UniProtKB/Swiss-Prot annotation:
Predominant localisation class: cytoplasm
Pathway recorded for this protein: Nitrogen metabolism; urea degradation; CO(2) and NH(3) from urea (urease route): step 1/1
Binding locations of Ni(2+) 2: K219, H248, H274
Cofactor notes: Binds 2 nickel ions per subunit.
Gene name tied to this protein: ureB
Any one GO cellular component localisation term in the record: cytoplasm
Protein name as catalogued: Urease subunit beta
Annotated NCBIfam families: PRK13207.1, PRK13985.1, urease_alph
Superkingdom as given in the UniProt entry: Bacteria
Compartment annotation: Cytoplasm
Residues covered by the Urease domain: 131-569
Annotated organism of origin: Helicobacter felis (strain ATCC 49179 / CCUG 28539 / NCTC 12436 / CS1)
Cofactor annotation: Ni cation
N6-carboxylysine: residues bearing it: K219
Keywords for this protein: Cytoplasm, Hydrolase, Metal-binding, Nickel
Amino acid sequence: MKKISRKEYVSMYGPTTGDRVRLGDTDLILEVEHDCTTYGEEIKFGGGKTIRDGMSQTNSPSSYELDLVLTNALIVDYTGIYKADIGIKDGKIAGIGKAGNKDMQDGVDNNLCVGPATEALAAEGLIVTAGGIDTHIHFISPQQIPTAFASGVTTMIGGGTGPADGTNATTITPGRANLKSMLRAAEEYAMNLGFLAKGNVSYEPSLRDQIEAGAIGFKIHEDWGSTPAAIHHCLNVADEYDVQVAIHTDTLNEAGCVEDTLEAIAGRTIHTFHTEGAGGGHAPDVIKMAGEFNILPASTNPTIPFTKNTEAEHMDMLMVCHHLDKSIKEDVQFADSRIRPQTIAAEDQLHDMGIFSITSSDSQAMGRVGEVITRTWQTADKNKKEFGRLKEEKGDNDNFRIKRYISKYTINPAIAHGISDYVGSVEVGKYADLVLWSPAFFGIKPNMIIKGGFIALSQMGDANASIPTPQPVYYREMFGHHGKNKFDTNITFVSQAAYKAGIKEELGLDRVVLPVKNCRNITKKDLKFNDVTAHIDVNPETYKVKVDGKEVTSKAADELSLAQLYNLF
């Protein structure tokens, strides 16, 4: 067999086993763990290449042939960092491995047949990840959705009804009528969507009615009163209907302290938002909750990574988002109680330790909806620069850290909200919500986004040009965004109760409608690469944080990767 140099191989087929790739301008280096393709039998589209009739393409149609094949993709996922062809059929991932023509090639997987009906997308040299999942959405403006989508987020979970004050402050779509309106509005968008109902209710029939109306879970928020009674009854109904509860705890400790909230939770699973506390929660020690086995702890992106500007920008954000008045002394004291540099500094290291498990945005309510992915990788890079390689790493790479951080916005939020059977990773059988990245732009600007197996967004040049690449090149909606395609390629998530009762038919929904499940039988140990439990303590006077008796903190960064190098403003 004729051999070519490794450099020539990479330029033609992308990196293979043992090759290392830098992510953006970070210090994070991945190493390809294995290559599922067969050397000498790689498939590639183009002039003089192999995807041709009688070569890598079979000439007879079959029920097994793919709709789309991504060739020689470098997959970065919680399942591994490896090279493979990805086959898509009927909107789902049909196979991952070696694609081609079994009649002519060795090692072709049975479910990766390239045939007359197969489109080809050249992924050699590109990184493929699962679409991001943002679980902390204030649905204040619909313009958030395309902004998030362009960043690589393909699923948004939260609540709201538009720019009402309740929505500006809390991620809640309250009541049957509002849920109906939001479920119908969801039809318009290239984005998977799920809505959280109001959990601040101690009368259980009112809670049940919202789940039966299509909510995928509850949000308990202090602005509506995060009392032990509300927490207890909300979790009762969540257990009954198998839905998740997200909570923003009681900053002012009006109805109890963090210990009282944990007592009301009583060991039941709950998803804590902005668990550090600057976004809200028991002052000064809500961060303690992150170490508990039944807590699924998340960060929102205004506090990660910790920089020299973090503290200063939070005051103004807080006053606006929670309808506070700088002329009222008590409102200013409320804001001051939430912004603690010491706990923010600890948050970065708690992510690196795998104690904090999920990242999200808090969109237009202190967080930036288009920066979940970027800020996750900035945090990973900042931590590597400050603390060095993780002890779990093997070889001259950062693969363990990369898997830890990609899990925070893909598989872990999917597990937390009962949608991991459908989305959240690059695995066979899941919906093909995939993001393609050039390594140089990884984490900051995707090349292309495939939604439900069809291209929905891409960087694209002048439509009047003779080729697709002349300037101006920017994100443009593709055919997956238009017409009835968006009904087949996007999911509206609802409760099992609403799904079984026929909510799709009742509301006349055209989109794919699927039920959430397995929300109540999980603990932190089910979260990938971020399952560490620990005893966390906060000094009530200095706000310093200790984990199992050892102080944890980090420095405020002066400069970040994935920042001004890639952006005009």
